[in-house]
Swiss-Prot record:
Expressed by the venom gland. Disulfide bonds join 11-71, 27-117, 29-45, 44-98, 51-91, 60-84, 78-89. Its EC number is 3.1.1.4. It comes from the Eukaryota. It holds the Pfam family Phospholip_A2_1. This is Basic phospholipase A2 PA-11. The active site is at residues 48, 92. Binds 1 Ca(2+) ion. Belongs to the phospholipase A2 family. Group I subfamily. D49 sub-subfamily. Ca(2+) binds at residues 28, 30, 32, 49. The keyword Calcium applies.
Amino acid sequence: NLIQFGNMIQCANKGSRPSLDYADYGCYCGWGGSGTPVDELDRCCQVHDNCYEQAGKKGCFPKLTLYSWKCTGNVPTCNSKPGCKSFVCACDAAAAKCFAKAPYKKENYNIDTKKRCK
């Protein structure tokens, strides 16, 4: 679920940036998404959005699905049984790892999406 996703982000980025910093970033980080991603981090969010969309098509509710995972050496690892829990966990873990690798550009936080996300 979204709280677990926030915790995964903290795991992967070693707590270096609050999870909420990603909630209003670029064109895809946060609710909804459209246009061309503004950078690598925003692309991580676009991929995550697409993953959640696929989960929804499988009958899952990714924002609410509780799953089992652990943080080992700043790597989020899923240990849920196959099905919605495993699928959603994999979406979140991949995004958290992607976030940890991508540079965070302050100028892409809280942008005017109407102008920049076409």
